[in-house]
């Protein structure tokens, strides 16, 4: 019993100390990292990859793209 407890605690500490996140976890902006070819936004919006982030944000196609990488906001058709 004690062996299992020690092993569990060791695994939890190792996981906590690495600071890694698993695929699919949300970032601060609430959009998951791109894992596959699914479009991350609702219909009618476009996906912007901000210059200071690794995750897409969803915005209206008429919004400014000045903060988007490549100055573009990708539509579902262009995804």
From Swiss-Prot:
Single GO molecular function: toxin activity
Primary residence: secreted
Propeptide residue range(s): 24-37
Compartments reported by the entry: Secreted
Range of residues in the leader sequence: 1-23
Disulfide bonds: 41-58, 46-68, 48-73
GO cellular component, one term: extracellular region
Keyword set, alphabetical order: Disulfide bond, Neurotoxin, Secreted, Signal, Toxin
Tissue/organ expression: Expressed by the venom duct.
Superkingdom per UniProt: Eukaryota
Notes on the domains: The cysteine framework is IX (C-C-C-C-C-C).
Protein name stated in the entry: Conotoxin Cl9.3
Organism for this UniProt entry: Californiconus californicus
């Amino acid at each position: 019993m004690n062996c299992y407890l020690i092993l569990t605690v060791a695994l939890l500490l190792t996981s906590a100390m690495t600071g890694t996140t698993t695929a699919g976890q949300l970032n601060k902006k609430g959009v998951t990292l791109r894992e596959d070819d699914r479009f991350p936004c609702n219909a009618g919006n476009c996906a912007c990859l901000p210059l200071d982030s690794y995750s897409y944000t969803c915005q209206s196609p008429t919004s400014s793209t000045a903060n988007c990488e490549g100055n573009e906001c990708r539509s579902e058709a262009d995804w």
